[in-house]
Amino acid sequence: MIYKSKFSIPFLIITILIITGCSNSVSIDEKKVFRYNEHSNISSLDPIYSSTLRNIWPVNQIFNGLVQLDDSLKIKPDLAKSWIISKNGLEYKFVIKNKIFFHYSKTFGKDSTRAVNAGDFEYSFKRLNDPQLGSPGSWAMKNVNSFKAENDSVFVIKLKKPFAAFLGLLSMKYFSAVPYEAVNFYGDKFGKNPIGTGPFKFKRWEENIKLVLRKNNIYFEKDNLGKNLPYLEAISVTFLPDKKSEFMEFAQNKIDFINSIDSSFKDKLISIDGNLKEEHSKKIKLISGPYLNTEYIGFYLGDKKSQVHSKKLRLAINYAIDRKKMMKYLRNNIGYAANNGFVPLGLNMENSVNGFRYNLKKAKTLIKEYKAENNKEKIELVLTSDANYLDIVEFIQRELQKIDIDLSINIVPASALRQGKSNGKFEMFRASWIADYPESENYLSLFYSKNLAPNGPNYTHFKNVEYDMLFESTYQEQNSVLRKRLYKKLDSLVIENSPIIPLYYDKVMRFTQKNVEGLTTNPVNQLNLKKVYKK
């Protein structure tokens, strides 16, 4: 006979203690609470400090901006219902939606609220641009000449020079609307007491223990059937400090979702073709898709005496690496072999740039020519990386042995790697680029000669007059089809000149419990919970 616990049936009505001055408990159906762990902790819930995913995810639940991205990275209205861009690309005029309200808060009076207006964006932009506040997102304001609320409904931004990707830039959470009343009330504690317009409102945050968000009952968005969003009643975030503990919580059904997994569990869950193993499919789900992150090896071209200054040598190295084999055996195909350009899948879904395919014969021919032209008998290079990518760089080391290159590996702390590549210290270095905003220009800026490190992201010190002219022309091209053609030409020039070795384009890997519905993935790895529910 099988006995069932008397506590197993009521679908686990859990009790969350909401601390509001005095302790009182509110019972919430467990199926209405979405639980996840943030192993990196959260530093602030103030949008102007949302520079990392750990901050961006909760901020995205609490705040809204002028525009937002859908899962295919198309610009959609958020608090702005419409906008007009001037013909010269310098002026953006936004019309703000009516009757959108901030979360109820004592900062507006006793448990009160007020509607968002254009003045809130003027105030929020000033905060982002205030050097005394030290926002890591202040760089996004460098091309902004002025911004002003013309009235309660119209907000105008004027740029110093045209920038066709500006709407994508505005989708970042830095540009969220915050109420001046709340900032004045909480001062520098606003980041721990956030007030926004988002689908969830702040309830409680015990640092290193738990963050609780509750449903915003006056949220303005509805689903396709006219039902109010969000569906969930609460979000509960824990802060276990390592991915292994996080995975164990997930395995015990104590959290609903994990973003990627610790490498030690990779082979247990993921097959060699990158899919969830059949034996786990009855208990959990895997949602995956392209991630705007390109992993690569950079060549420092600032030293003309260096061997890697030879384009022929760089091409040979690129042809000598079997990226598909690397992805299959080292990463279980979690990601996509970078056999095309530098711009990753997600922005370049057509995959139309012809990149490097494994061609050992061609690589050997190029090396033979390089040795003859430079009177070289032996080629010795040094590749610098941090320890997290040791398996990748050792694979490259073995591949280059096949073309008679002696590659030494220099492992340094991540901080030393960042500093060294900025200062031109390493002839070859492992790096990655995650998009700040969803535009190919963000990747291609790494090869613009006016962006030389340490003052910009051009760590390779690649310089090319044709490239610079094409890159500058993208700023003014408002036609997205024509702009994509320019991006393709630029990406092709990167491959042709090979200042880098594209390794792979990353992939978002989201694991959920079987009863989680409505969670999607997107190339910027944003967490959108307003349409999520649990069966």
Spell out what each predicted region is:
Residues 37-87, 126, 195:
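N-terminal lobe/hinge region of extracytoplasmic solute-binding protein
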Residues 133-180, 201-206:
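Surface-exposed binding/hinge segments that line
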Residues 335-336, 368-435, 508:
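Ligand/substrate-recognition segments at binding pockets and active sites
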Residues 117-122, 152-156, 198-199, 229-234, ...:
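Alpha-helical secondary-structure segments
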Residues 200, 337-370, 385-391:
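Structural transition elements
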Residues 315, 327-330, 406-417, 445-513, ...:
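Extracytoplasmic/peripheral linker and loop segments enriched in polar/acidic and small residues
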